[in-house]
Amino acid sequence: MCIRDRRKQGIKIGSTTGYTQAMMDVVLPNAARKGYTTDKCVTPNDLPAGRPFPYMIYQNMIDLAIPSTDCVLKYGDTIADIKEGINAKVWTVGVILGSNELGLTQKEVEQMSPATLTARKAEVRQRMLLAGAHYVVDSIEELPKIIELINHKLNTNH
């Protein structure tokens, strides 16, 4: 999934992080060099609290002029991410591969037996669903399908 493609659809990319603003001042330029940029990145620095509280999502909504939580999707790789999204009452999607919850490097994933990897992914999926995730995907490549599904639900009031 290319972020540029989402932007062409009018989707704004907001980010929340547990890192401090000083840390993000180092991380964001490096991420941009690798092709990842956000329209807004919110840290807990100037807010009452970070995750799992919803304040960083709400600050993104304010700064990006998004009027409704129905129009927000929280995508994350930790249980704290999932709880942040649920507490903000936004669509919440967990990701498994590359996640802190799975705790494996790409090389470890590639070297793991398919049966073991399937079992580990099922454990993470279950934890994310129990934390309240609306959807859980293996990778970001599945996100366009989830966005399409959510848009369909919003357009049909389901």
Regions found by a protein language model. Give the residues of each.
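Conserved ATPase "switch" residues in P-loop NTPase domains
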Residues: 7
